[in-house]
Amino acid sequence: MIWRRRAGAELSSLMALWEWIVLSLHCWVLAVAAVSDQHATSPFDWLLSDKGPFHRSQEYTDFVDRSRQGFSTRYKIYREFGRWKVNNLAVERRNFLGSPLPLAPEFFRNIRLLGRRPTLQQITENLIKKYGTHFLLSATLGGEESLTIFVDKRKLSKRSEGSETSTNSSSVTLETLHQLAASYFIDRDSTLRRLHHIQIASTAIKVTETRTGPLGCSNYDNLDSVSSVLVQSPENKIQLQGLQVLLPDYLQERFVQAALSYIACNSEGEFICKDNDCWCHCGPKFPECNCPSMDIQAMEENLLRITETWKAYNSDFEDSDEFKFFMKRLPMNYFLNTSTIMHLWTMDSNFQRRYEQLENSMKQLFLKAHRIVHKLFSLSKRCHKQPLISLPRQRTSTYWLTRIQSFLYCNENGLLGSFSEETHSCTCPNDQVVCTAFLPCTVGDASACLTCAPDNRTRCGTCNTGYMLSQGLCKPEVAESTDHYIGFETDLQDLEMKYLLQKTDRRIEVHAIFISNDMRLNSWFDPSWRKRMLLTLKSNKYKSSLVHMILGLSLQICLTKNSTLEPVLAVYVNPFGGSHSESWFMPVSESSFPDWERTKLDLPLQCYNWTLTLGNKWKTFFETVHIYLRSRIKANGPNSNESIYYEPLEFIDPSRNLGYMKINNIQVFGYSMHFDPEAIRDLILQLDYPYTQGSQDSALLQLLEIRDRVNKLSPPGQRRLDLFSCLLRHRLKLSTSEVVRIQSALQAFNAKLPNTVDYDTTKLCS
């Protein structure tokens, strides 16, 4: 393409050489840009992947080739020459004077031969293949001279490390390359000689020297003295215009369509755009015209290289000093689960930094892989055969924790297996078992070992609280029988007990002492005021080796004839003492608690048996039963089926005689159980003076068993009563501080036991 400067250009000489004005195929991209207003740019990406001046430029091609070869860094030093802009004077004169373009006769003849309705193939053969798709409007002359050094930093660093042990003179560092690049324009020959020597001796760098521009750079001292130059280098800044503007109106649209089909489809199909998507409608001879096989193959090769790099990164991490040092510091005297390894991991700052470095490298690698995969899918979406894409999975910290376990426990006889914490076993290569090492014992809480045995790491040496060592394993401790301390059960079955209670059999009667200052048995008394009575056993004085269980209560109450009085009973039970303040109230007829059963006796007087049956369901400890008797007056209500009760003092006529009442007898039904206070005191002494650690734990377990069984017999309520403290205070005569100390020791020991739930109790005894 021949050009003159604007001052001395001749139009005739430019038009005579019109073939030089129409550019070749690599300038087609601006023709596509001319119709970009009606089509989106993104659908063209797959068509423009390997065409156009940018992708065909030498600098871009060199960069892509070096990147595929593994060179990660580029250093470039360059200098530019003066820039001059030249214009197409023929087009400029047409725009200014409005005169027609003096086109070459051959060009006119080819247009006439096309006719009014040419096919796309005719336009391609007669115009596009001869004259191209664009002509040049303007260009910038000049050029640059540059030196480019591509560097593989990994190979360079390894070479530098290896050279440190040999000679310092042969080492190549980034600083050396910087100095050589800076001296290129000062002493070009010696610099290139040194760089080429390094390139031959090492594969860590690639050196490229370029001198671009239509002037041949330093061949011209002054552009004013140049008569004409040839503009044909794709590196220059050029302004193009589509050839269709030179054609008649009836040919312009068909020319654009033919040009797009020629450039985008290589004349193998017709270029079509629809619904923001463009593709080639392939001809019968080229069914794969939409499938850029070379690009797809290059991307598949890139993915393979990424997989190899991924393996290299992981291998470098395992071979790093930080990884090896971390493995050496891991304790070997007990089994390490993933949680323990993770805790040790967080304590090693050097290992953490090395893993973060691996993570960052992997993120960059996978981002690159995802971009390639996305582009690969876009390129192959119209291929008949889809590419096979296989990428390795990202290795999370969980993978590395399991990997570390595999190095510890599945790395015998030169074979590395895979460890599973769930099954506590190894999976060895080729289904062998020779890679499995002896697993040390598991140290932890509950049934895990406290320490491993020093002579055999696979077995427990000591156990946690509440567990005992048995054949190298820790098993839950079971409290020994507490029957020789205190009894809880009777030999009678439930049905037998129920029958004896119904019959008020004297064989289950507990003989208690009746005490009352308000009345006497078998004596009539005025029931207008509340009467208090109690039945007590005085076990500390008479029956110190027994505790007692109440199953029922029976009273025989008689009234004078025609009396309208109704007895009302309130019962309080003290489990191990005698005072009323440490007694609990029986919730008679509340919720599911039993009610009094009244049975009339065949006697001349109004006598009734009042019986309260607790049975095995509601049985509880008792030492003293407090009974409070008061009376109420029964009267008919407004309706005949209703009864109204009055307090005696509320009656209209206080002077009226309401009758008398007497209690013939009171019986307590239940049974007595064995109780050894001295043995329990000895058990408590072991908390302060244990013979061995095992004896103290055994004593605590037995006391816990006694405490829970005693408190389980507390009366119904939202919270259990603390009957065990009452037992310690009244039957063992312990001080309040001693009781608090024992309860605290039991609570602390119970918290260490497995699968135990402590419960809150209500204080009963002070």
Curated annotation (Swiss-Prot):
SUPFAM superfamilies noted in UniProt: Growth factor receptor domain
Domain MACPF stretches: 74-264
Glycan-carrying positions: 168, 337, 456, 562, 609, 641
Domain of life per record: Eukaryota
Segments passing through the bilayer: none
Pfam families, per the entry: BRINP (PF19052), EGF_BRNP1-3 (PF25415), MACPF (PF01823)
Tissue expression pattern: Expressed in the brain. Weakly expressed in embryonic stem (ES) cells. Expressed in ES-derived neural stem cells (NSCs) and neuronal cells.
GO cellular component terms, A-Z: dendrite; extracellular region; mitochondrion; neuronal cell body
Signal peptide annotation: 1-33
Keyword Cell wall biogenesis/degradation in record: no
Protein purpose: Inhibits neuronal cell proliferation by negative regulation of the cell cycle transition. Promotes pituitary gonadotrope cell proliferation, migration and invasion, when overexpressed. May play a role in cell pituitary tumor development.
Identification of the protein by name: BMP/retinoic acid-inducible neural-specific protein 3
Source species: Mus musculus (Mouse)
High-level lineage: Eukaryota, Metazoa, Chordata, Craniata, Vertebrata
